[in-house]
Amino acid sequence: HFLRNHPLLDPVELQDVQNKVLSGISWESVRDYPADMFLDSEAIYSTCYNPVENPGFAPSADAVRAILASVEAEPLEAQYLSYPKLDFDVAVTPGRIVKRTANKRLGGYEEWLLSNGVKVYYRQAAPVKANVHLATIWRFDTGYRSYPADKLTAARFAAAYDNRTLGFRGCERQALRAFPELSGVNILTRTQQQAASVELSAARGKEEAAFKTGWLLLQEPYLGEEAGLEKTKADNLKNLGRKPNPRTAFEDKYTKQVYGDHPWLHPFDSAAIEAVDMALLREVYERAFTDFAHLTVFITSDLDRADIEAYVCQYVASLQGEYPYQKTATALPKPVLKGRQLITETNAPESEPVSNIDYMYVADVKTTTRCILVSDFLDYILSARYLNLIREERGGTYHVGFSTEVPDNPTLPWRGVVDFQTRPEMTQLLVGDVRDVMEAMAKDGPTAEEMDQAGKYIRKRHGELERRAASSLLEQNDRLVRTVLWGRDFDADYDALLRGIKARDVRDLARKFLAGDHIVEIYTEE
């Protein structure tokens, strides 16, 4: 499986096997490879295809022999791989942990307050058999609220560029991959509506490199050269200059109408792209990634605790910088349409006539573990009902389902979504079916058989998710984030909650969706 790359071992053991195989390969064994494999043979078999119009396209058997003979005639010279050099040394004045607070949730984690004001949430994980042994998220409480209000759309474009290119010491992100010092370190930066984050994970033995990378990205950032930015701008402007896709244009209008022309959701236009320059790239980076007074670092690792503490003091507690920017009080985007709203558009077909239907229910629901579990029941049962009616009985689509979108932020509404494609002539009938099925669920609730089937599926899926989380520090760290920031409860007695879900709970959630706002999007090509 080493040669074919179909591992029969867990990743760590596979890596050990590969290293042992590679360590046994020397230049002396490689030097004789061509002769051993291709020349010391009584017969050479070749299968090739020569097109009629180009009969010499593939070499003949004699030509192949001549090529191999020329290789044997010349002594092979060793050409070892060479790597670029990276100055990875940093001079820092370490800080310290000034306060520790223990929390019993998630099996136990700690909150550390550092001497520079940064908060760290650290969780010591059980050993995992995976490549990632350190997962970190460096989260700044900035996001879109930190951008200049008069250049917001341009700033969002600049942020997208920053997130792709951000590196350090004259190297963009892509170039950093060439350095052996950073092998085994994964880097991701992102700027979202509510926060900006640097996400770093590392293999065993690369934990200090990960922390050092975080320090360099935040203290010695490199955003690339102007030529790279201008090429990206030119490529995007070229795409804007092409004939707009009718479906994309409709989606932009739909978003604008549903969310009340929220400034964070404006599409990139030529004016916004043209307004981006190197100065704005730098300003957007500083607004997103230098507010150290509001930096929170989440760490989950199965490595030595003392080492993690030392790296935190050296590379996190030493972060310094002023933050002169003000943040806006812009509210998060929420659907502003009330009641039942129908948004439609019809255009000429690109191929076959089709209607794309997205039926969205919007309702305020309290985000608790129990409510999320109730939504799992509703998703499973409604999906089965929609599939049975719209696909099996009506023959109206290949796939249809219902899914509840639960936001991390509990101040945002829940959304229940049914989306599918159908033939234009069936649109009105099937849109009516979507509402009728929800009305029936809100009136009578699910049957005992439906509850039993849903419960079995949900219990099985939960077990699969727990097994995956137990082997993934990235997933465990994500749970730490959601526990601390949004109050999610992953310690609840899942089986007890599952047994406590009744048909009336599912019916009541359906009633909330039915009583909420309905936004129906229909895009037709015929």
What are the functions of these language-model segments?
Residues 25-29, 33, 222-229, 276:
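Peptidyl-prolyl cis-trans isomerase
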Residues 276-283:
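Append "and occasionally in soluble cytosolic enzymes with long acidic Gly/Pro-rich linkers
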Residues 288:
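A short acidic-Thr-Gly-centered motif at the start of a beta-strand
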Residues 4-148, 283, 291-364, 372, ...:
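Proteolytic maturation boundary segments
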